[in-house]
Amino acid sequence: YEIPLRLVGSEMCIRDSIIPLTINDSAWNLQYSPYVYYNEHCIVFNNQHTPMKIERATFRKLLDFVGLFPHYFVGSNADLPIVGGSILSHDHFQGGHYEFAMAKAPIEKTWVFPGFEDVEAGIVHWPMSCIRLTCADDTRLVELADKLLTAWRGYTDESCFIFAETDGEPHNTITPIARMRDGKYQLDLVLRNNITTPEHPLGVYHPHAKLHHIKKENIGLIEVMGLAVLPSRLKQELFDLADVLVAHLPTAEYPEALQKHAAWAEEILAKHPELNADNVHLILQDEVGHVFAQVLADAGVYKLDEAGRAGFVRFLESVK
């Protein structure tokens, strides 16, 4: 996977300029983010202070937006805790003039939904579980996306540890992304589930504890699409880790701030006997990318193995 990396702080700021828009016959605004995680990174938000919710109207709004700005993508964070990823509770999207790694990923398995033979559909070859829909008629995409959302909200497959709800708490939702592709509308629907267990109290489909030294935070829209938004602490930690790796310092002697990376450091040294002062930073960047790929795999509800692929197909077959 082509995985760009970004190190960020904790505060969200937005430039002052506001561009009014009409999407789904309602008043929205566009602002550009100073973070610039990617080219022309923008926030699109509802004039009315309404809670974020993934529903049929969400797909209509996303497709209206890319109809206005066909060179932009736009997407929404999911609407449940753990898998949401947003620090804003207000109804909003994120967009920009950028092609993420997930957008470049090919279809792994094509699919035809009954009654929607005019919609190109399939499973995307990506660590997270993504259904891609493409059609020249955006209303058809809205109809099929809504059908898939409704089906997923109520779907349980115990053999894949997918439960629609436990004790009345809903677990299933979708992270949707829209774009134009060769003159057609396209939606990527990423299946999400926020169930927790004693073994994984932060989420079964969330970065597992072994990876928390790199990424512990929620996997939101930007990460889903393949851009690693990493905690700012890593900038100094990786520089310091490079020094101790080159010096072959025993992990027991690592500074306290680097102890969390000790097991990973041993894996890196075993994997890269050629490591030296000239290549250590490139090696670390590459290895962080591998960790982030595993982060996405942890967040995927259907794993990239035989059982996961079979489970994904069972869900698609259930959509009538």
List each language-model region with its residue ranges:
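Helical scaffold of the NTase/Pol beta-like nucleotidyltransferase catalytic core
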Residues: 17, 49-74
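Beta-rich nucleic-acid/ligand-interaction surfaces
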Residues: 81-89, 167-173
